[in-house]
């Protein structure tokens, strides 16, 4: 963690397993695209997030990334303010940004090194290689882990596109609940669908 920041927020409650807040949760369909997704590491059980999730399928599983800290202003009355601590900058996200820069320089070996460093801390027993990335994101990846891209710049088909899809997948996992996905959505023209619970 390079920079932590605090905020008065009920965000942890809004993304929890509460029926009234399920609109803002992370339902199982989205979990299968992020924290429970297959990838170059193999199946979802290889990701180190697998055993940190809890909750029900109906209201969404909870990944306790932003935990609430409650500060009592009056203990007798039981009132106070909810706080969260967020990580504004992490070395993990920085590695993925640098890997993306290497991809656009066509320095795939250095991109693989950064992706390997990320996988070392996020996935069990993963060995990353150019061929593994090209094989998975070139043919095995599904619409859950590989989105249609419509950028206003050129991405070469083949190896460069496969590496970009890999980075976007890893960044989506790394930055869940941080709002940084919107930068990727805008840059790459990824279509977003907002599903309403029960409709």
Q: Which residues does each PLM region occupy?
A:
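Acidic/polar-rich alpha-helix caps and helix-coil junctions
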Residues: 1-20, 40-199
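Residue-level signal for threonine
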Residues: 27-32, 47
């Amino acid at each position: 963690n390079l920079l932590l920041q605090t905020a008065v927020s009920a965000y942890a409650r809004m993304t929890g397993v509460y029926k009234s807040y399920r609109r803002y949760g992370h339902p199982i369909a989205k979990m299968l695209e992020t924290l429970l997704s297959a990838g170059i590491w193999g199946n979802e059980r290889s990701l180190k997030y697998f055993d940190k999730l809890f909750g029900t399928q109906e209201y969404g599983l909870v990944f306790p990334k932003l935990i609430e800290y409650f500060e009592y202003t009056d203990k007798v009355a039981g009132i106070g303010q909810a706080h969260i601590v967020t990580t504004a900058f992490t070395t993990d996200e920085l590695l993925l940004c640098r890997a993306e820069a290497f991809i656009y320089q066509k320095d795939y070996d250095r991109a693989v090194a950064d992706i390997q460093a990320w996988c070392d801390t996020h996935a069990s027993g993963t060995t990353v290689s150019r061929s593994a990335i090209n094989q998975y994101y070139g043919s095995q990846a599904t619409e859950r882990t590989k989105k249609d891209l419509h950028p206003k710049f050129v991405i070469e088909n083949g190896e460069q596109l496969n590496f970009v899809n890999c980075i976007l997948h890893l960044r989506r996992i790394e930055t869940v609940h941080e709002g940084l996905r919107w930068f990727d959505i805008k840059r790459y023209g990824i279509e977003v669908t907002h599903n309403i619970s029960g409709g």
